[in-house]
Amino acid sequence: MINLRQQIPHYLRLMRFDKPVGIFLLLWPTLWAVWIAAKGAPSFKIAVIFIAGSVVMRAAGCIVNDFADRHLDKHVQRTQMRPLASGSVSVTEAMLLFAVLSLIAFTLVLLLNRLTVELAVIGILLALVYPFLKRFTHLPQLWLGIAFSWSIPMAFAATVGHVPAVAWLLFFAAVLWPIVYDTQYAMIDREDDVKVGIKSTAILFGRYDRLMIGLLQGSVLLTFGLLGWYLRFNYWFYLGLLVALGLMCYQQFLIRHRKPPDCFAAFRNNNWVGFFIFLGILLTYRN
C-alpha cells in the first residue's frame, strides 16, 4: 500500500520541482513566442495556458526521461539517487503520475484551436522519443532543442491561427539554444556517459566542445538579430541581446577548464540568457 504523504517528496523530485531552472529554460522560448505572436499584448487565457502547459510538460518529460534511463542512472554518480533509479518511486507510480500530467496538459490544449491541438500531438511525440535517442545518436541535444521549442509554432497557431515565417525563424534560434546549454550539462557526465554507452554532443565535440558551443552561441544571437531586424524591434531588444552576449562570454569563461561544477554553473546561467532576451522583447513592445 502506497503511503501518499511519504511519497509526495519523491514525486516532486521525480518531476524535478526541486530544480526549477529546467522549467524556466522551457518557459522562456514559450514566452518569447507568446509575446511576439500577440505583438506584445497576449491574451490572459493564452498566456496562462502556455505557462501552465510548460510547467506540466516539463514535469512529464522528466518522468519519461527517468523511466528511459532508470537502469543507466544507477551507474552514473550524479543520477544514481534519482527516484526511479534508487527505487524510492516504482515504475507503476511513475507511469500513473505521467498519465495524470498528460491528462492535465491535454485538457489545457483543448481550450485552444484545432491547429494548436494538432501541433500539441506532435510535441508530445517529440518529448516521448527524446530520452531514448541518447542510445543511438550523438545528437539528442538537437532533438531536445526541437522538443523544447515546439511551443513556438503552437503559440503562433493559438494566437493568429497559423504559423508564419517569423515563427520558424524564432524556432530556429530557439532550437540552437538548448544544444548550447545541454552540451554544457552533458560535459558534467561525459566520462560516466562514455562508460555506460550514452551518447551526447559533449562526447561528439570532444576537445572542440568550447569552440562548437561558441559557434552555436553566436548563431543563436545572429538569428535573434535577424529576427529583430525583420520585426523592426527597437534598441531595447538589442540591449537584451548584448546582455545575453555578455552572459555567453561568461559561460565560456566558466567552462574553460571543463570542471563539472563550473559546467553546471554555465548551464544554470542560461536561465538569465532567456530572461534578458524576453525582457528585451517585452520592453520593445512597451516603448
Swiss-Prot record:
Gene Ontology process terms (BP): ubiquinone biosynthetic process
Bilayer topology term: Multi-pass membrane protein
Pathway linked to the protein: Cofactor biosynthesis; ubiquinone biosynthesis
Gene3D superfamilies (UniProt xref): UbiA prenyltransferase
Catalytic activity: all-trans-octaprenyl diphosphate + 4-hydroxybenzoate = 4-hydroxy-3-(all-trans-octaprenyl)benzoate + diphosphate
Pfam family, one: UbiA
Chief localisation class: membrane
Transmembrane residue ranges: 21-41, 44-64, 91-111, 112-132, 139-159, 160-180, 211-231, 235-255, 263-283
Keywords, ordered alphabetically: Cell inner membrane, Cell membrane, Magnesium, Membrane, Transferase, Transmembrane, Transmembrane helix, Ubiquinone biosynthesis
Gene Ontology MF terms in the entry: 4-hydroxybenzoate polyprenyltransferase activity
Subcellular location(s) of the protein: Cell inner membrane
EC assignment: 2.5.1.39
Cofactor(s) the protein requires to work: Mg(2+)
NCBIfam families membership: ubiA_proteo
HAMAP family: UbiA (MF_01635)
Stated role: Catalyzes the prenylation of para-hydroxybenzoate (PHB) with an all-trans polyprenyl group. Mediates the second step in the final reaction sequence of ubiquinone-8 (UQ-8) biosynthesis, which is the condensation of the polyisoprenoid side chain with PHB, generating the first membrane-bound Q intermediate 3-octaprenyl-4-hydroxybenzoate.
Family, per entry: Belongs to the UbiA prenyltransferase family.
Protein name: 4-hydroxybenzoate octaprenyltransferase
Species of origin: Coxiella burnetii (strain CbuK_Q154) (Coxiella burnetii (strain Q154))
Gene: ubiA
